Amino acid sequence: MNIRADHVTVFVARPDASSTSHAFLQLRRAASDYLGGTWQLIRGCMEPGETAVAAALREMREESGLTAQELYSLGPVETFYLWPTDTLVHSICFCAIVEPASQIILNPEHDDFRWIPRHDLDAQLMWASERRLVPEICRDILDNGIAKPRLLVQL
């Protein structure tokens, strides 16, 4: 078995029009790509010598053209198994807040995007490991929980 700890996952949120809630970004994988046609969060691998924070910010720019206004480190690490390569993957997770009017610029890995209202996010995430992070994001970051200042990454 292979074990990798060089992945990042980024939940991207933006305030909705009323500024009373948030919506989350999902990108649809291009049909010709791995997991083609599925809706995904921003994910990727760290490059040699790159920190997890730098990788999260780079993957955001590369996959969506977005820049984080705020970035939060989530406590849990997402862990999943890729059976085709017999690989256990540990992915460091972040939540990025972007400006409401931010424009999406997709890279060739993706062919569409959508913003999912906060209350619908759990039902739209394909992986259980992602769904387990939603309560922490909502409680600690979006609802200004007591951990929020400690999770904020200095950019």
Language-model segments: which ranges?
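Nudix hydrolase/Nudix homology domain
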Residues: Y34-T38, Q103-L155
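Conserved N-terminal beta-strand and adjoining loop/helix that marks the start
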Residues: M1-L25
